[in-house]
């Protein structure tokens, strides 16, 4: 398959801003395909250290997104450092908090590429649930917890379990 990288003019969003928006669109697309709505946190309104909320019929799951081209999930896990403020906020949340690491190529032009009959996302993502009882300054995101359609079923079960329900 021949692919064409995107030619990208500099229209103002720096690479970190692009990573933030891309990770949100990655998860938004997955949720849309599964028939779920999401509530993205408006830029500069991230006062609870939550980037998006996944809306299940019964309740919600909160998600903190990280996007990296450096953490490539080459090993069995990747470490993500946590701010004390995030830990404090997530520990008070009544809803489950999931941390998602979206991995993208180092060259931004290859995050999405065009082929003759498709657009391909060159990204993959992994997740871990934040343990509210721990006070660690980092989390290990396991390679085994790849974000797929089944991840949403797992999260749904965790959300329901918090209210005494089951899937």
Where are these regions (language model features)?
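Mixed-charge (Asp/Glu-Lys/Arg
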Residues: 1-48, 53-167
